[in-house]
Amino acid sequence: MIITPVISSPATVDYPPNPNFGYKSILKKEFLAGRIPLKKDITGHKLNPKYLSVDHTIPKNKGGKSSLYNYSLMDSFVNNKRGEKPIKQFIDLESLVEYIMVMLNVKTMDLDGVDYLKGWLPNLLKAMKEGK
């Protein structure tokens, strides 16, 4: 797909909307606003707003997409340590269950936790099964 910018004035360039843009921001925004009351990420590490990142469940270089359903909130140090290593090496089962239980109860204007889990869990299971 070729993206053609629209030049509305010499100083500005408007690009067509990107349907995937901002999904990382939605998870972060909702967490930082206190609407996702998670204490830990799926690896068992405490979520600190200062060190908050969004992890690709299936890394992009292994076929993962840049979409909400391939993202999870994660401590930035753990995310950097994980890199492209398989997610199952990092998952803490108790924390994963807590992540799911919290997300089941998230319902905001921008994020429906049930809808998120319906898309995210299949990606997580695929990543674990295929060693991604």
Over which residues does each language-model region extend?
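A detector for short metal-coordination/catalytic motifs
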Residues: 26, 69-72, 76-132
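Histidine-centered nuclease catalytic patch
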Residues: 42-73, 82-87
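Short aromatic/hydrophobic-glycine micro-motifs
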Residues: 36-37, 45, 106, 114
